[in-house]
Amino acid sequence: MAEAATGFLEQLKSCIVWSWTYLWTVWFFIVLFLVYILRVPLKINDNLSTVSMFLNTLTPKFYVALTGTSSLISGLILIFEWWYFRKYGTSFIEQVSVSHLRPLLGGVDNNSSNNSNSSNGDSDSNRQSVSECKVWRNPLNLFRGAEYNRYTWVTGREPLTYYDMNLSAQDHQTFFTCDSDHLRPADAIMQKAWRERNPQARISAAHEALEINEIRSRVEVPLIASSTIWEIKLLPKCATAYILLAEEEATTIAEAEKLFKQALKAGDGCYRRSQQLQHHGSQYEAQHRRDTNVLVYIKRRLAMCARRLGRTREAVKMMRDLMKEFPLLSMFNIHENLLEALLELQAYADVQAVLAKYDDISLPKSATICYTAALLKARAVSDKFSPEAASRRGLSTAEMNAVEAIHRAVEFNPHVPKYLLEMKSLILPPEHILKRGDSEAIAYAFFHLAHWKRVEGALNLLHCTWEGTFRMIPYPLEKGHLFYPYPICTETADRELLPSFHEVSVYPKKELPFFILFTAGLCSFTAMLALLTHQFPELMGVFAKAMIDIFCSAEFRDWNCESIFMRVEDDLEMPPAPQSQHFQK
């Protein structure tokens, strides 16, 4: 019974929907019938005569003014359409038609039709969109005092945006603070320092934290004269204060390295003490987690200082030791620093070993992973690659593997080749990047362009093959080939991360819709005709009459038919006559 009742209700509902669909036709015929019945009381014939008389009395100037007014309104609509498209990336009229008018006219709403299918895939797609649009810490970020500030002193431009620096401040508060910092005066000061917006205020707070720690140790040491050395070890200096000074106050890499070495001494002592107390409660566990982050950060920056100062082998050893000591801390992406250092040493076998570990389907990809894999495969064939020879004999297996690796890398981040091929100018990389975005492309090319130039023929192979990727994925926002569809949010996030003087690379490149171009041409042509008709009415009348005579002439019709149907002389039964004198004029 329940199934029968449900079926009856569904049938009744479908009948009602069907009746509402065709109700407008019934309404239309009813209106026509009422107009016919009331034609005498409403004096429809007299009104039609009056309207026709009014239209006959109108002069051509009225039509010219009407055309000009309509062209002006169309131009305003066009300007609004262009502004809306530049800001939101879509046509306003198209969006209104699809979103609002299509459901009213009986169109199918994609959201409602796919409601049943979206329940299974919503979670996966949402997770993917969140991961694709997540902002990551740049593993190869520069030093503010020794590199970013020097760029500002020379050029007068700010290489970092407020949004980027705000994200760095949030990272510092996450990595270098914990809930028990208020128990130690120096850590309490540094907790406030990481939230300061003014760089000088942060540097002053770091010096204050070091001075407080020094004064406290001097006061407590004389209390127990027999254990002076023990008291000095009990009160280590603040490691996070040294980190801030090394990052922002040091004007050279050598000065930053000295400060990081002092921070390492203080941070190592705090780490060993908190390691022994981490199981005594949640407070000690949080403190040990903070000390671990501080120690890993210091060692990583020391390795980067060694890399900047030319001690590449020492930097590689420090990075390997750090990855062995803390294998679970993947948030710093130390393997990307290691890959760049190994490429500098031209240790391609070691690079391949690192890629074999991290270029896994279960691990998140990056431009460094994909393009380094492409570089290694291109290195095997790039010195002998020739586009002409490849077009004649076809691609070999090794060349095909290299081309596929380049296509894979370009699909992941299509902005990188423009910087590697020097089609766009490089800027200093930001402190945060967006995977598959322009910011990640800048960060990768800034450090890896020299490695591509060092491999003979690699850039030539990239130049010949990278654009072929776009033929494999004609609709990258809807469907990808080896990766998920390209995220839409990259342009907005990159504009927040990159400085205003840099032209953000957009993919896929937005083109003006045909509707806007057609409207612009039609409005411009109509406005020009209206202006010419108003200024030169007699001349435009002669021109219009001549055009009508040309298009209505027999010669033009014969010539048009001959050009379309490709008639031959035998079918005409006479030789083709030359064009008439009237048509030649």
Swiss-Prot record:
The modification Phosphoserine is found at S386. Glycans are attached at N47. InterPro entries: ST7 (IPR007311). It is a multi-pass membrane protein. Keywords: Glycoprotein, Membrane, Phosphoprotein, Transmembrane, Transmembrane helix. The chain crosses the membrane at residues 15-35, 62-82, 512-532. Its main location: membrane. It is found in: Membrane. Pfam families: ST7. One of its GO terms (cellular component) is membrane. PANTHER family: SUPPRESSION OF TUMORIGENICITY 7, SUPPRESSOR OF TUMORIGENICITY 7 PROTEIN. Belongs to the ST7 family. This is Suppressor of tumorigenicity 7 protein. The gene is ST7.
